[in-house]
């Protein structure tokens, strides 16, 4: 059955937002703004569209909220966040709607939020197992603010708070994929060509049809046990990366169906905060592992620990293991010359954060290292809050690897140094 309007929730929420955002009392409308300029230069020549840089842009954001008197009994709130982006790399001017929601409380234990919104949950730091909501890794790898790692979805979210457990349900009528690396701004390893590819890549990603059967569903049930919070997760939808191949010769890819069942536990451990999370990825397109055109099922495990060492210094470490299931079937289905993935992929991360000068300076070092892939990704950054309104941030994205086909090794020629200036008012 065809969905009559794939973006119906967005259109409805935005319409209500625009109409209701004209309160009789201007004081009832809360607005905030920021203007930001960002630039990032590459340290290597490559085959991308513009070799000298991969970030040059200015953006202006408006964020507003309003509590309409007509829905006062339901504690309703309308929120919106919109941006105007002048992108020098793409040579384009874009209007971006990041948020347009109506939230209300129809009962004491129920909250509802409908419209365009950023959804997230899970316990990882830059590592996501049960968070199957869309991400923008192009922004992440080129120096944009962390806010832009999370991509908004058109969704209905219902939260129920009960003594037995609390429940979050998110329904996404239209599948929103990740913003994937395609070669335009960042080069990558193209498995169909067996080489690093840039702007010459001509990939086509086939999104699922907008039908009732393809509506995505995400659920989380969570409860506190003493000082620990435990959670169960369920997701039914699609991989957010195009991990299926329609036709390798014409570089056509699709997003395979996916169900995920997971859990997490988080609480105090040895003077810090520990977390453990796991998820079983059921790849509906290839449960046997024999189809080389679709992703195998897998299990992912994550353990993490963070601690405040005092004097405004904190550290955090994580260890992730990704286990491919039916690995023998995967190996037997490989074609001649294809890069071979490991059955177990290991990934460790380290975060060190230091605040200085009355907490106006924030220095962060974040590192990814995979002992199985023998590659790494380093993210140093320093932010300085010059005034209450102005902040300057500088950092780098550094990739290290010995093989072209590994997660971070494929990006070795994409090293970049960036700077951002933001003025909020």
List where the protein language model places each region.
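Transmembrane beta-barrel strands of outer-membrane/channel proteins
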Residues: 33-41, 78-82, 114-116, 169-173, ...
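Detector for outer-membrane/organellar transmembrane beta-barrel domains
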Residues: 71-72, 235-237, 266-288, 292-368
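Outer membrane beta-barrel
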Residues: 65, 70-188, 226, 401
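Repeated loop/turn-to-beta-strand initiation elements of outer-membrane beta-barrel proteins
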Residues: 29-31, 70-76, 110-112, 164-167, ...
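Outer-membrane beta-barrel "beta-signal"
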Residues: 398, 411-425
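Hydrophobic, lipid-facing positions within transmembrane beta-strands of outer-membrane proteins
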Residues: 56-62, 97-100, 152-156, 215-219, ...
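Outer-membrane beta-barrel strand-turn architecture
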Residues: 66-70, 106-108, 161-164, 224-227, ...
């Amino acid at each position: 059955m065809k969905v009559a309007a794939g973006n119906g929730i967005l259109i409805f929420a935005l319409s209500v937002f625009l109409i209701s955002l004209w309160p009789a009392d201007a004081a009832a409308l809360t607005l905030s703004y920021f203007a930001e300029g960002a630039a990032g230069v590459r340290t290597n020549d490559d085959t991308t569209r513009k070799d000298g840089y991969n970030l040059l842009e200015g953006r202006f954001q408006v964020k507003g909220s309003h509590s309409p008197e007509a829905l006062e009994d339901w504690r309703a709130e309308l929120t919106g966040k919109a941006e105007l982006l002048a992108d020098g790399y793409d040579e384009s001017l874009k209007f971006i709607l990041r948020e347009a929601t109506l939230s209300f409380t129809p009962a004491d234990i129920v909250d509802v939020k409908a419209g365009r919104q950023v959804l997230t949950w899970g316990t990882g730091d830059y590592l996501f197992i049960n968070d199957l909501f869309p991400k923008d890794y192009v922004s992440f790898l080129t120096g944009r603010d962390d806010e832009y790692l999370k991509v908004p979805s058109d969704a209905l979210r219902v939260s129920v708070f009960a003594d037995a457990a609390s429940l979050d349900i998110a329904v996404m009528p239209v599948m929103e994929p990740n913003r994937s690396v395609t070669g335009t701004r960042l080069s990558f390893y193209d498995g169909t060509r067996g080489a690093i590819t840039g702007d010459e890549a001509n990939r086509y990603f086939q999104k699922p049809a907008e039908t009732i059967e393809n509506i995505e569903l995400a659920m989380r049930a969570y409860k506190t046990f003493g000082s620990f919070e435990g959670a169960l997760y369920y997701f039914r939808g699609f991989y957010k990366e195009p991990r299926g191949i329609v036709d390798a010769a014409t570089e056509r890819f699709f997003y395979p169906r996916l169900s995920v069942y997971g859990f997490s536990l988080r609480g105090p451990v040895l003077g810090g905060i520990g977390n453990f999370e796991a998820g079983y990825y059921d790849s509906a397109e290839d449960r046997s592992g024999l189809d080389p055109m679709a992703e195998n099922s897998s299990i992912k495990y994550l353990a993490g620990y963070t601690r405040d060492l005092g004097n405004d210094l904190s550290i955090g470490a994580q260890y992730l293991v990704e286990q491919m299931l039916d690995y023998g079937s995967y190996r037997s289905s490989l074609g001649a010359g294809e890069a071979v993935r490991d059955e177990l992929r290991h990934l460790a991360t380290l975060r060190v954060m230091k605040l200085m000068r009355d907490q106006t300076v924030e220095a962060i070092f974040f590192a990814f290292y995979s002992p199985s892939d023998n590659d790494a990704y380093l993210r140093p950054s320093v932010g300085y809050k010059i005034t209450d309104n102005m902040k300057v941030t500088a950092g780098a994205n550094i990739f290290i690897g010995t093989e072209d086909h590994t997660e971070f090794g494929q990006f070795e020629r994409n090293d970049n140094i960036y700077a951002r200036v933001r003025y909020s008012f």
